[in-house]
Amino acid sequence: MLILLPPSETKRDGGAGSPLALDRLSFPSLHPVRREVVEAVVELASDHEAAVRALKLGPKQAGEVERNRAIPSAPTMRALERYTGVLYDALDAASLSEAEWEVASRSVAVQSALLGLVGAADPVPAYRLSFDSRLSLKRGAASLKRRWSVAGAAALRDRDDLLLDLRSEGYAALAPLPDRDGAHYVRVLARDESGEVRALNHFNKQAKGLLARALIEGGAAFGSTDELLGWAAGEGYELRPAGDGSRDLQLIVPEVRGVPGSLMASLRA
């Protein structure tokens, strides 16, 4: 199976890996677009003011332009270690065992706006680019969705395994899921005291990170939707078909534990 994660706006600095080399990344069919986007981002960064405007950076984020300017020579680290934030804190890549890293390497991909789909262990540099960022201030310049969607969709269409999409909708549009059985977008819902379910906003990313971690620990070797749902039920997770005619799955968060300022979504009641 392949678990698809969104990236994060925040990223760790540094790294011990050698600079970006496209031939070391998964999904080689994406190399032409990767090369095009990286070149455009680096070129944009040569004009500081234009980059600040195009990337919608605030005064305290101006240093992100230098990050982008340095992409060709910057050190790299594994993708799951590069990204930070709520989802990645919950996934906690730093505590994965060697065996779990092997599972993640073959079963997890991150949807980067800069590099497209990358494997969990692919070496990536620090950068600043979002799915809705502009690569040029020129009128009519191609959006990232326009640049990535065809190649990204083809990369997923070539696969015949189970696809579990935990990306936000903006990033999912950069590589749309194929329209087939076994390709599922996951929506996170919360169950309130009355038993009703509703969209979960604040803890959405956290719940996705916890699910991704559980899948990695479980081996992420499910060959069908039924196998996945059976595993989830056995582990005490409520993962179910949306029942609305789509192929979406719903992940129900039964409760949030902790105290204000230190709350945590729980996937088990």
Regions found by a protein language model. Name each.
Residues 1-62:
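N-terminal "assembly arms/tails" that initiate or stabilize quaternary assembly
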Residues 6-7, 19, 28-32, 59, ...:
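Proline-rich intrinsically disordered, low-complexity coils
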Residues 16, 67-70, 90, 190, ...:
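Generic signal for short, ordered secondary-structure residues
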Residues 53-126:
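A glycine-rich, hydrophobic loop/mini-helix early in the fold
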Residues 93-269:
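Internal, well-folded beta-alpha domain core
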